[in-house]
């Protein structure tokens, strides 16, 4: 059995947490047994030390354990970004999800309202008139019938309300929770396309996905700073296939050359 005092002392001494330690401290957060100041101290200490894959995996497993699941009968994909790139693009991943669904791919889209950008996937769908407050069975039905279902993160990860105040106090600084949204899909999507906020986070995300058993994934970050594949700059890519990490960098889909404005 671990304790908060042991965990925070280890982090302050710049020691990485094991998966079990990370699971314990994150589960304590989600259960509401830690105060806001204790949660903040852990998140800041993780940032100061530098987050490692075992910590991401431990936190992700704790989130997955208490999430409200969506059961699907076919393989599903998800495409999303971590957010936090500071560029404030429109919500590209939701557009990509629509195109994928229209081409016959089963998409289980996991998302939220905007936190660090102008528009989150939930904002797009809400403004389009979609009902975000669907039961897991209804989400599964949508996926089966129209190839697209949306899982509004606050409904499927209700324990996240226990860390909201601490995250808000730390903002605009990113925390380990920026990494967790894409890898805690309630439908357990085994095929994923994930954009990350910084090139330095690519291997962290890829290693975490492999440890969590994701069968296929692409992790990317564009060289103009977006958690997207850019049409203005080359994009660095890491592919995961059958638990093997394949580094393919850079990749180019340039349509415009600098200094073309992003808008």
Residues of each region from the PLM?
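Catalytic cores of large soluble enzymes that bind and process phosphate-bearing ligands
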Residues: 14-18, 31, 48-55, 117, ...
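Buried hydrophobic packing segments
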Residues: 46, 96-104, 121-124, 205
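Short, small-residue-enriched loops and turns at beta-alpha junctions
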Residues: 47-49, 83-87, 114-116, 158, ...
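Active-site-proximal loop->helix
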Residues: 113-130
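A short, hydrophobic C-terminal helix/tail in secreted or cell-surface proteins
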Residues: 259-263
């Amino acid at each position: 059995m671990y304790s908060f005092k042991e965990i925070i002392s280890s982090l302050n001494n710049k020691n990485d947490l094991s998966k079990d330690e990370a699971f314990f401290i994150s589960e304590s957060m989600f259960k509401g047994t830690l105060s806001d100041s204790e949660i903040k101290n852990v998140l800041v200490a993780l940032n100061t030390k530098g987050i490692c894959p075992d910590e991401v995996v431990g936190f992700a497993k704790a989130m997955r354990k208490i999430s409200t699941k969506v059961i699907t009968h076919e393989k599903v994909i998800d495409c999303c970004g971590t957010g936090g790139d500071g560029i404030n693009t429109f919500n590209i991943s939701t557009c990509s999800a629509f195109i994928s669904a229209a081409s016959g791919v089963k998409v289980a889209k996991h998302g939220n309202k905007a936190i660090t950008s102008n528009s989150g996937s939930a904002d797009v769908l809400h403004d389009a008139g979609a009902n975000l407050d669907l039961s897991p069975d209804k989400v599964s039905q949508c996926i089966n019938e129209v190839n697209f279902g949306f899982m509004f993160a606050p409904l499927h990860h209700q324990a996240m309300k226990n860390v909201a105040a601490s995250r808000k106090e730390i903002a605009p600084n990113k925390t380990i929770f920026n990494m967790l949204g894409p890898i805690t899909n309630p439908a357990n999507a085994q095929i994923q396309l994930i954009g990350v906020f910084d090139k330095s986070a690519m291997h962290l995300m890829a290693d975490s996905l492999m440890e969590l058993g994701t069968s296929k994934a692409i992790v990317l970050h564009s060289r103009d700073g977006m958690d997207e594949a850019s049409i203005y700059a080359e994009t660095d890519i890491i592919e995961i296939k059958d638990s093997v990490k394949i580094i393919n960098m850079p990749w180019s889909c340039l349509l415009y050359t600098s200094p073309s404005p992003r808008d």
